[in-house]
Amino acid sequence: MLQQLLITLPTEASTWVKLRHPKAATERVALWEDVTKMFKAEALLSQDADETQGESLESRVTLGSLTAESQELLTFKDVSVDFTQEEWGQLAPAHRNLYREVMLENYGNLVSVGCQLSKPGVISQLEKGEEPWLMERDISGVPSSDLKSKTKTKESALQNDISWEELHCGLMMERFTKGSSMYSTLGRISKCNKLESQQENQRMGKGQIPLMCKKTFTQERGQESNRFEKRINVKSEVMPGPIGLPRKRDRKYDTPGKRSRYNIDLVNHSRSYTKMKTFECNICEKIFKQLIHLTEHMRIHTGEKPFRCKECGKAFSQSSSLIPHQRIHTGEKPYECKECGKTFRHPSSLTQHVRIHTGEKPYECRVCEKAFSQSIGLIQHLRTHVREKPFTCKDCGKAFFQIRHLRQHEIIHTGVKPYICNVCSKTFSHSTYLTQHQRTHTGERPYKCKECGKAFSQRIHLSIHQRVHTGVKPYECSHCGKAFRHDSSFAKHQRIHTGEKPYDCNECGKAFSCSSSLIRHCKTHLRNTFSNVV
């Protein structure tokens, strides 16, 4: 297959393919696809030129002969590649589908421009869903002796001490001669007039056009540009193929340059290939497009923090982390909310704040479908489903869902109560507790039920009350299956199964499972004491 592909290519493309040494069948498919797309673009270009040049009779005659010769010489065999049974078996299903799509597309394009009249056998096989591989001797209909002789000519030229420029100028493409819109320009390039004079007679005898000097080619190319308004200019877009080779997409038309169009195509192709270079971390195998990103990533593994704050001495691994930190010292808050005018140090903080105005809650729990405006809110909520309490108090061992609850709890052990009520001088460990307490003096009840209008001083009390209307009982006993609206009711019920009685009477030592039962029991002692006094 590789020998066949090299024969159907011009010298520049043949040299470019050989330098890459494609061995596997998948590699050859990718290279073949790239080249066939160039063939299609040039075939369509010939048709466009015929349509756009209708002004003068002379130009119509010239283009008519050019199109006729192109139709005769550019056939489906020129843009197709066949496989042996062994090569076809090496292709993955995705590569086989790719081959089938491109072959059918190539045939359709040639039919549309009148370059293909009869349907090849491989197209019939592909349309029927059959495997298109051929016997070794039947590939492309090329006799084995002819194939070997043509291949040997080019391989021997590569092995001799001939420069790439001489090879480029000296070798002619055997199949595509005068009249092919793609290779007519390539066929006229030569290194110098000396090479032209040595090879002219031999080529004329074979029906090939003589090679001309680059100066002559440039003049003819300028005249050709005047006749044709549109020329192909390849715009490369890197698309990862089956083996990571670049493919070409989106061909556009533009004014031609002074160099060979196919040469420009190969240059752009090579540049696209170099752009695909990536950088991989040797430790975690993470891949980066730029070396500077890999350098920054490596500091995670090495622990290096080269960027240090001059105010407090805190160090950072990236300069982008140091800049927001310095705003703490300068007080700068460059990110402002357009709705309320509130400012923030970080753009992420502004984004989270804006969701308060928009009501957006992009983070949704998959278990209960509850939504949150911040990811941390979803993480904390998920712990309620799995009953995970990762934050543990070092003094008493009590665990909490959130770290702020742990911080609030730790104040109990220290005994610090910095928040004092101005009315009754009662002290509290948290500002929220003080705020809730002050509502007992003011009588404020800001949380109102939408169903019945009942108001509450705390949000938690409203949430518990709403379960009366919804009928939700989230606390279920694992022993008997009984459900409860309140966690306090659930805790009392659990003591029935465990037999726990934490409430003891100071008079007689009798124990009870509920505080209300202890209160009722204590009243019996009071009645007895009162009756004895009387």
UniProtKB/Swiss-Prot annotation:
It is found in: Nucleus. Its main location: nucleus. It comes from the Eukaryota. One of its GO terms (biological process) is regulation of transcription by RNA polymerase II. InterPro entries: KRAB, KRAB_dom_sf, SCAN_dom, Znf_C2H2_sf, Znf_C2H2_type. GO terms for cellular component: nucleolus; nucleus. May be involved in transcriptional regulation. Essential for Golgi structural integrity. Belongs to the krueppel C2H2-type zinc-finger protein family. This is Zinc finger protein 69 homolog B. It comes from Homo sapiens. The gene is ZFP69B.
